[in-house]
Amino acid sequence: MSKYFSEEFFKEVEGKLGGDPTWQQATKGVKSTIKLSTTDQGTSYLVTIDDGTTRIGKTDAAVQAEFSFEGTYEAWTKLAKGEVDLQSAVLKGHLRFRGSITKILFYKDRFVRIADIMKSVPLEF
């Protein structure tokens, strides 16, 4: 069991994405970066997508990414537990989004897969 929003957790997510044919097919030809940050714990992780390959690693909060989602650990926990979906969390202000709205809408179905994979990892909070 991984501690949520830890390096161990994100390495497990990275492995699951790497072994997920749906994700690999959906991200063929895609080059993007997504930063996921907790505002109250000061942790940030960078998801790097490059033509079907995905890497996730700890990063500095100042690092720029094409898309960024930030919120409290509690907000991320609600997402992990399925109490709220990513879109609702952003629309309700639980998570703050930065990046191109038009482009994220184009990638929406692909990126929702990351949230689904995150929910599939056995967690401790």
Give the residues covered by each predicted segment.
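Feature captures hydrophobic
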Residues: 1-125
